[in-house]
Amino acid sequence: MKFTKMHGLGNDYIYVDAISQKIENPNEISRFVSDRHFGIGSDGLVLILPSDLADFKMRMFNSDGSEAEMCGNAIRCVGKFVYDKKMTDKSTITIETLAGIKVLEMTIENDKVVLVKVDMGEPILKAETIPVLSEKHPVIDEEITAKDYCYNFTCVSIGNPHAITYIENVEEFPLEKIGPLFEIHEKFPRKTNVEFVELIDDSTVKMRVWERGAGETLACGTGACAVLVASVLKGYVGRKATVKLLGGDLTIEWNESDNHIYMTGPATTVFEGEIDI
């Protein structure tokens, strides 16, 4: 299997052109290639496929083999993958995902993609669609307790579920201990991604994320979008802000005119190779 390892702010995946090669058992392949000791090492696997609805289709799998609806960092890399490999000559493309069709605008320098702006669509705020078991709409400050820990979560879906809460110091927060307790909490029928956020100022927030099916990652694009939406709903920031993640910064905007969220950030190729599967 020919592959390209890429990352968006350190959120790394193995990217495979599944148009020119047939890929079977992607769940198993993702578990294998993601292993950082016995495989290639990544947060998961991304397949680029043909689409009847868009320019391309992406399917993505977490390191535990589960399939995810969308990943903001991964979709930026898909844009770079198809442009840099001359699978398209367009700088604006559409990608079909399980979370709908996304539009990518790519910034090109020296015939390579350096930045990608993604129209992530409208945020989902309805409890049963996120999904989260709550009577609130929107779900702001839902008190949830797991073991001895209690937080007020604001819940948003960006095609995948997110639960966001605010703390004073994200760097010292024991995420690996507390994150998984809420990821699998019974309030979330399909589990959830969990974001812990520190407010810097009215246009900057800092976050760490415990991703559903992957654990802590250096960055989560949909998580950054969800954090911006939650922070606007709570009156903490304006509609455009910098979201600081462990792997770097993303610019997120929640546009008032079309209600869409726009995410802008880098996409980086690490190396290419072949592996027996």
UniProtKB/Swiss-Prot annotation:
Pathway linked to the protein: Amino-acid biosynthesis; L-lysine biosynthesis via DAP pathway; DL-2,6-diaminopimelate from LL-2,6-diaminopimelate: step 1/1
Keyword Metal-binding: no
InterPro entries to which the protein is assigned, alphabetical: DAP_epimerase_AS, DAP_epimerase_DapF
Protein name: Diaminopimelate epimerase
Record carries keyword Cytoplasm: yes
Gene3D superfamilies: Diaminopimelate Epimerase, Chain A, domain 1
GO BP: any one term: lysine biosynthetic process via diaminopimelate
Alphabetical keyword list: Amino-acid biosynthesis, Cytoplasm, Isomerase, Lysine biosynthesis
